[in-house]
From Swiss-Prot:
PANTHER family noted in UniProt: FI18240P1-RELATED (PTHR47327), PROTEIN CBG21204 (PTHR47327:SF11)
Keyword Membrane (UniProt): no
Chain intervals with Basic and acidic residues compositional bias: 107-119, 556-567
Protein name as annotated: Uncharacterized protein F52C9.5
Length: 645
């Protein structure tokens, strides 16, 4: 073979090997890229550099991709908690943000919801904390959900919230994190960090999440800063260690104002003048107690007293003097095993800042102020209270109450206001509307429907007397203002009052006679007290001769022959047309609950088979009223309610 041919063959072989090597590198590069695309988080191998003179996407795109992956890994490593969106949590502006279970419906517009949570895409919490404070890690606009704080402190500043967390490292609970509400100045302490399952962290405007860091070093620093802070600071109204003679007015929420204005302005002289026994309740009211069995107030024993009976404890707390020492008593614990009472100027959450602890031989008693007339008619000094319990299915009235005591007073005056006797109720502390629910039954009559409530902060209470209440011992027809209560087997709501009560309130003049009844209302001089707007009903009275006053309707079978009374002609008809029985009344009551009352306003409609009584929807009082003679039994046609159709 000529040398020229051998040289040409050698060159061809060399070029072929070079091409094969280049193709191999390209295949390896493509394979590596495919492997890396299958795993966005990590690159298993680095691609082989292309041969010199070959053009690709160049090193710039590869460099940018590598930086993107490294930034993603770094972000994941710095993320301290779980990321999720607002839609993962069912909550409202007035709701408890620490729970994610389904809540009661709220009267809340879409615009207010959007204002609260402006952009769903911005609900992801940033993972980088604020470390400007060496004692705490701060996560701005964040809250804890799926968890409940072990303690809530209201009307307190951020400095005191930090100090309390650092000081709460030993005991039943240890502060591991807290959430501070910058608007309402509420401090919620938690015994765990915010991302400890099942708890999670969520972005929430106006609230910040904190975790303590160097507790030992920061404790002295925080206490020193708190004690030396100027009076003009944000915490001027909440000193860390107030004297017992001037306790802080602790609120459960901004909706729970338990006589705040009265307690803030009341002086010792006013208390002394108002009551010889130094009762701190305002005029016209008297102290009584809500009792919680099986619990005591933890670490709040200002004074102790050995007694023979729990009534002695109540007397000492009402007088605000224990063992000769003045103490503005708000609650006390009674230990049955040692017959000892422990008094304190603090109350349990959500009204105060104290924490209840289970103890079998103890009972916790919290002071409240109720109408003096009710206390006098009901000798019982204690009323049952059950935190986080509710009675299901027997709500007769739902109303708005600014405080627990207002709701309790509403229950006491339920007959005058709503026409039924309230025996129990529930107050939802964190609701602004429809937060007071009154029941016609209680846990003793409906044990199977008495259950726990773990979503909202609520108190269940009962209004039961050891002896029947005067002129209200029997149950009235629920939901109906009973004008003719004698006819349905209950006592008549006719109480003779003078025009001026003991508390100084006055009554309007009696109305003109209508359907054999007269009404009058108490002058509403103070709209904060519900009893000021109470209503009374009585039989029509002849102003010329009061001796002619008598019951317009008498119980069936019990009509009396009285020679000193002039019997009207329609009484004869009433005796011939008997009054409804209890069974008939119960049946009508169930129909009203099931289908409502369908009758023209202010017209007396027939609801029973007899024509003795009917029902009327009074447009002025917004209540159902008993009325007489809805029909004439001698006529073949008459007006009747759709209840009978």
């Amino acid at each position: 073979m000529p040398s020229s041919h051998r040289l040409s063959a050698t060159i061809l072989i060399f070029l072929s090997l070079t091409y094969i090597s280049s193709s191999s590198n390209l295949v390896e590069d493509i394979t590596d890229k495919q492997d890396s695309s299958e795993d966005d988080d990590h690159l298993q191998t680095f691609p082989t550099p292309p041969p010199i003179g070959t053009t690709t996407a160049s090193a710039d795109s590869l460099f940018n991709r590598m930086n993107k992956i490294l930034r993603k890994e770094e972000k994941q490593k710095s993320q301290n908690f779980q990321i999720f969106n607002e839609k993962d949590l069912v909550t409202n502006s007035n709701a408890n943000p620490y729970f994610s279970t389904t809540r009661k419906p709220k009267n809340r517009s879409d615009s207010s919801q959007k204002a609260r949570d402006p952009d769903p895409q911005n609900q992801v919490i940033a993972g980088i904390p604020d470390l400007s404070d060496p004692c705490f890690r701060r996560y701005e606009n964040s809250i804890i959900v799926n968890a409940q704080p072990y303690e809530r402190r209201s009307s307190t500043g951020l400095i005191h919230c930090k100090s309390h967390c650092l000081n709460s490292q030993i005991g039943v609970y240890s502060c591991r994190s807290f959430v501070y509400d910058n608007v309402n100045r509420v401090c919620d302490l938690f015994a765990h960090v915010g991302d400890q399952a099942p708890a999670r962290l969520l972005k929430f405007q106006t609230r910040d999440y904190f975790e303590p860091t160097d507790i030992v070093h920061c404790l002295s620093m925080i206490n020193g800063e708190s004690s030396s802070s100027a009076p003009s600071s944000e915490d001027e109204d909440s000193p860390p260690s107030p004297p017992p003679s001037a306790p802080i007015v602790a609120l459960a929420t901004n909706t729970d104002k338990r006589d705040e204005h009265e307690e803030m302005t009341e002086t010792i002289e006013d208390i002394t003048v108002a009551s010889p026994s130094s009762d701190s309740c305002p005029r016209g009211k008297q102290s009584t107690f809500l009792r919680t069995e099986g619990f005591e107030l933890f670490s709040h024993d200002d004074q102790e007293l050995v007694v023979g009976d729990v009534a002695e404890c109540a007397k000492a707390c009402i007088e605000n003097k224990i063992n000769g020492v003045a103490l503005k008593c708000k609650s006390f614990d009674f230990l049955s095993s040692t017959s000892t009472c422990a008094f304190t100027s603090e109350a349990a959450v959500p009204v105060g800042n104290g924490q209840l602890k289970q103890r079998e031989d103890a009972s916790y008693h919290e002071k409240i102020c109720v109408s003096k007339s009710f206390v006098e008619s009901c000798p019982s000094t204690f009323f049952s209270r059950h935190p986080q319990m509710i009675l299901v299915g027997f709500a007769e009235s739902v109303s708005d109450s600014p405080s627990f005591e207002h709701c309790f007073d509403t229950c006491l005056n339920s007959y005058q206001l709503f026409g039924f006797n309230c025996t129990s109720g529930m107050y939802y502390f964190e609701e602004n509307q429809l937060n007071c629910i009154l029941n016609s039954e209680n846990r003793n009559t409906q044990r199977e429907l008495f259950t726990e409530e773990n979503t909202d902060i609520v108190d269940y209470f009962e209004v039961e007397c050891t002896t029947p209440r005067s002129k209200q011992s029997k149950r009235k027809m629920a939901g109906v203002r009973n004008f003719e209560t004698d006819a349905i087997g209950a006592d008549k709501m006719v109480t003779d009052h003078e025009d001026v009560e003991e508390d100084g309130s006055k009554w309007e003049s009696w109305s003109e006679c209508q359907d054999g009844k007269q009404t009058r209302r108490k002058i509403c001089a103070n709209f904060n007290q519900i009893e000021d707007c109470a209503e009374e009903v009585r039989d029509c009275v002849d102003e010329i001769d009061s001796t002619d006053m008598r019951m317009s309707i008498k119980r069936a079978g019990e009509l009396e022959n009285n020679d000193h009374e002039q019997i009207e002609d329609n009484n004869t008809d009433a005796s011939e047309d008997p009054v409804p029985t209890k069974e008939e009344i119960a049946e009508v009551k169930q129909k009203i609950r099931r289908t409502g009352f369908k009758c023209p306003l202010n017209e007396c409609c027939r609801v029973f088979l007899s024509c003795s009584y009917g029902l009327r929807h009074n447009s002025h009082t917004k209540q159902l009223e008993w009325c007489r003679r809805p029909c004439d039994p001698s006529l073949s046609s008459f007006k009747r309610s759709r209840l009978l159709r």
